[in-house]
Amino acid sequence: MKNAAIIAAAGSGKRFGSRVSKQFLNLSGKPVFLWSVEAFASIKSFKQIIVVVPSDMVEFLSLKYKTGFVCATGGNERFDSVKNGLALVGDDIDFIAVHDASRPLISKKDILLVLEKAAKTKVAVAVEKAKDTVKLVSADGYILKTLDRTILRNAQTPQIFKTELLKRAYSRKMSAGTTDDSQLVENLKIKVSAVETKFLNFKITTKQDFELAEKILKS
């Protein structure tokens, strides 16, 4: 089985509040995005790693890191960025993993768990159990109901797809309100498997998240 990974690293990270996009900040000795690249590169079946970055970073990164991955140019939206990465995937690739560069703590074990499930079901997504009580709220600000937390999961990445399925999903126009890749496949009326991650895999969104990730990596 030959697999590819698309690392989405083209976001501006406005909520983080830094002049340098968070995925390129130094995190315990290496750029944030490189932690994810190395996690996928440690798995032999991943023959191709594509990092989608802002257009002004493509040449710089291609020269700085001449082996290990190739760069694709990011688009205006995440959908466009992943689609640009998808265009570089080889014809012999069986499964494609899409992963957020801002989740640098992803473990080899969790990648393999999601990949194993995807190999059986064609699509699998990393998830974590919802920890907080979740309320359904009306447009005018009133609580309609409390959702059953035991069946709620927070979607993470990687999200791993049979190649032809992801390409088919991305050949269609993105629907309004689509927030992740698996939703595109759901729109094809295809069941998506959920795999609970075993290790910390949070997304770096704030400076507090960054500091926590640094503490974990140094411990």
Swiss-Prot record:
Keyword set includes Nucleotidyltransferase: yes
EC number: 2.7.7.60
Family label: Belongs to the IspD/TarI cytidylyltransferase family. IspD subfamily.
Function noted in UniProt: Catalyzes the formation of 4-diphosphocytidyl-2-C-methyl-D-erythritol from CTP and 2-C-methyl-D-erythritol 4-phosphate (MEP).
Pathway(s) served: Isoprenoid biosynthesis; isopentenyl diphosphate biosynthesis via DXP pathway; isopentenyl diphosphate from 1-deoxy-D-xylulose 5-phosphate: step 2/6
One protein family per Pfam: IspD
Protein name, per record: 2-C-methyl-D-erythritol 4-phosphate cytidylyltransferase
Protein's GO biological process: isopentenyl diphosphate biosynthetic process, methylerythritol 4-phosphate pathway
Phylogenetic classification of the source organism: Bacteria, Pseudomonadati, Elusimicrobiota, Endomicrobiia, Endomicrobiales
PANTHER family, alphabetized: 2-C-METHYL-D-ERYTHRITOL 4-PHOSPHATE CYTIDYLYLTRANSFERASE, CHLOROPLASTIC
Molecular function per GO: 2-C-methyl-D-erythritol 4-phosphate cytidylyltransferase activity
Swiss-Prot/TrEMBL site (Transition state stabilizer) positions: R15, K22
Recorded superkingdom: Bacteria
Site for Positions MEP for the nucleophilic attack, residues: R149, K203
Database matches in HAMAP family: IspD
Keyword terms of this UniProt record: Isoprene biosynthesis, Nucleotidyltransferase, Transferase
Catalytic activity from the UniProt record: 2-C-methyl-D-erythritol 4-phosphate + CTP + H(+) = 4-CDP-2-C-methyl-D-erythritol + diphosphate
Listed InterPro entries: IspD, IspD/TarI, IspD/TarI_cytidylyltransf_bact, Nucleotide-diphossugar_trans
